[in-house]
Structures are given as C-alpha cells and as structure tokens.
Amino acid sequence: MKFLHLGDLHLGKTLGDFDLIEDQKYILDQILHITEEESIDGVLIAGDVYDKSVPSEAATKLLDYFLIALAAKRIKVFMVSGNHDSDERLNFGSTLFASNQIFISAVFDGTLHRQSFVDGDTEVAVYMLPFVKASQVRHYFPDEDINSYDDAVRAIIRNTLIDKRNKNILVVHQFVAGKGEDPALAGSESVGTQSVGMVEKIGYDCFDDFDYVALGHIHSPQKVGREEIMYAGSPLKYSRSEANNEKSVCLITISAEEGVKIESVPLKPMRDLRHIKGKLKELLDKKNVKAPDDFIYATLTDEEIINDAMGVFQQTYPNTVRIDYD
C-alpha cells in the first residue's frame, strides 16, 4: 500500500496582511496531482489542519474541496487534530465522512482508534491519535501516573492492543524528540528546549510498536530517532525562519516483503517566501530583482532609516511582508 504523509496545513493562515488561501489551494492541487501520479491508497494528515481554532469560511471550504477530491479518487484519508485546531469543529461530520473512507480523529475519547485494511498479503492498521494534553488523558486512566505529555501518550499506547503481526502506522500531532537531540524547529512556533508552541517534548521510543509514525507539529521535514518516525513538515513556508527550507511530502510504501520504504516528494509553491538582505538601492536594482511576486522579508543594511521603506519596496515587490534593519 502507498500512503502520502502531510501535516501542518494551517489552512486560513496569513503572512502579515497577505491571505494565503490561493497559495494553499495551489499546493493542495499539487498534492492531489501527486496522489494520481503515485497511485496513492491513503493520505495521512497529521494535525494543525487549520491555522486557527475558529477557521475562516474560506479555510473550511478549502478543506472540503480537498477532502471531496480525495474521496472522488477513492483515496482513504486519516486525519487527526493539532494544537491549532478546534477538536469539535474538526470532528463535525466525522461519522458521515467515514462512510466515504475519510477517517477523522479530532477528540480523544479514551481509545486510540484504528482502521485496518488488507492489501494482498499485507494487513495495515492505521491508528489515529489527536493532539492530547495530560489533563485530558488522566480522566480515562485514573490508575496511571500522568503528569506530562510524555506520560499521557505512553499511557494511551500502553493501554492499546497492537497486533505486531500487522504493519502498524500511527498518525499523531506532538513534539517528539530523539535521545540527546531536538528536531530542527524552523517556523514551528516558539523554540523552547522542552516545548514547542507550549507542547512538551515526548520521547520517540514510546512509538517502538509502530512501523511508521506520521508526525505533525514541526514545520521542517525530518526524521526523529529512526527513519520510520517522520515529520512531513508544512507544505508551504509560513515564516521567515523557513525561507531556506525545501518543502515536500512523504511517500510511504508498505509491503510484506520490503517493509516500509520512505521517499520525499518535493513541492513547488505558487509564490516562494524569501529573505533578502542589503542596501535598499542594491536590492531594488533591476539586475538584482527576481520573482517579484514572491513573499519577501527584507533586512536593510542602510545606515539611516529610510522614509516609507515599505511603500518603496512594494513598488517592486508587492508582496513584501516585513522590513527590518541590521
């Protein structure tokens, strides 16, 4: 079976005053094209589907468009909530969606829900864990000592029967770290050593029973601890710190013979996000200007503050998001 792993869509997000809905539709259409090219069986969406707990109408319509397109292609969808999402809003209509093989787990109810499928000699079980806090999980396991995010996730997995004869996938939205090292945090909210976006660190070893772990929460694509525990990263650049990142989705092929094979499929945005630095006159010189429709963060090295620098800059780069000085 072939799966496409993505996460951190942040539908409805803005860059400064700029609406990204058109850019997000463009990248989702690109992902739909990849599902056709690669004959994808299922799409794993690892949380932060929306950018805000109360998403805009445009954001909800865009998600509907994406899910309906996947359903029309008979592609299964496995989607969990992230810390940016409203559990109840994302869960709305989940029972109806399930009839079209769109499986949504947005509210933790004490059970790590699973969907199982057989493909030839391979049985694949996809487990879905929405974003959870210790206080939510403690209620369901009163005999467990749960005081942290790590405790909470370990308790859930410990109380779940996992058949190791299957190929087991987990879709989860949390801050997961390796032994002695943290993930690269470009664009991923705050960057504390023990938490990201107020989400505490979880040890990757709690996922030992899973053949592949589809992570969401960190915007930079990367493995954590072992090859089969992956952050897909966000499909678009959402902050200046992501300017040098290359965006992609993870293509996962699972078979009884070869186990789990992981490939990266690059994504190309409609408009890139770039950080440029130099004197204003040099940056706006025609010979130095390229892709003027890109989203631009500019750092000026002029010795004096330039009057209405933003207005001047936007005459050449209309989608300039921010200007600062060095």
Model feature map: region roles:
Residues 14-16, 47-67, 81-101, 106, ...:
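Metal-dependent catalytic neighborhoods of phosphoester/phosphodiester hydrolases
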Residues 112-124, 129, 229-292:
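Binuclear metal-dependent phosphoesterase catalytic core
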Residues 37, 42, 254-326:
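Accessory, non-catalytic peripheral segments of nucleic-acid enzymes
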Residues 40-58, 76-88, 175-198:
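Active-site neighborhood of divalent metal-dependent phosphoester/pyrophosphate hydrolases
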Residues 1-68, 72:
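N-terminal active-site segment of His-dependent metallophosphoesterases
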Residues 92-195, 235:
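Conserved catalytic scaffold of divalent metal-dependent phosphoesterases
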Residues 6-7, 43-48, 76-83, 103-108, ...:
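Active-site neighborhood of phospho(di)ester-bond hydrolases with catalytic His/Asp-centered motifs
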Residues 182-260:
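Conserved beta-sheet core of the metallophosphoesterase superfamily
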